[in-house]
Amino acid sequence: MPLLTIEQCRRQCRVDGDYDDDLLSELLGSAEDSAAAYLNRAVFPDQSALSAALAELPAGAAAAAEEYASAIAAAASESNAEMAKAMVEVALAKRDALALARNRVLHGIVVNGSVVAAIRLMLGDLYANRENTMVGAVAVEMPAGAKALLRPYRRVMGP
């Protein structure tokens, strides 16, 4: 569920009309993903969405554990050593990805004004700088204001 309406996106990017609505929706998704990745937390529109995601964690963890055990058992019965090694590596990668996703939900956050403002800043920046090459400017990965707004809520401090 998007954290901003299309009307809010249009106002943020100073767009009159609906001609860029599809692009704005895509860029909003990118801005939300970027904020969540920077925070290393899942971002939810309200407490009920966070609570629902938390309620699903135990069943998801059990299913992931069963899938991992099944993959390891299949690898153990594989006669080709290289194939078995690859099967174990894939199982580990899947397990780690699911653990990361579960951890992000476990430490999820309900959006607040700072997170929404950061998402708006990133949306505006993505819309204004849609091209890969900018003339006369230096490209940055995230607007400085967005980082400042998100930093207090970030789980893992780093660059």
For the regions a language model picked out, list residue spans one by one.
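Divalent metal-cofactor coordination and adjacent catalytic microenvironments
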Residues: 1-159
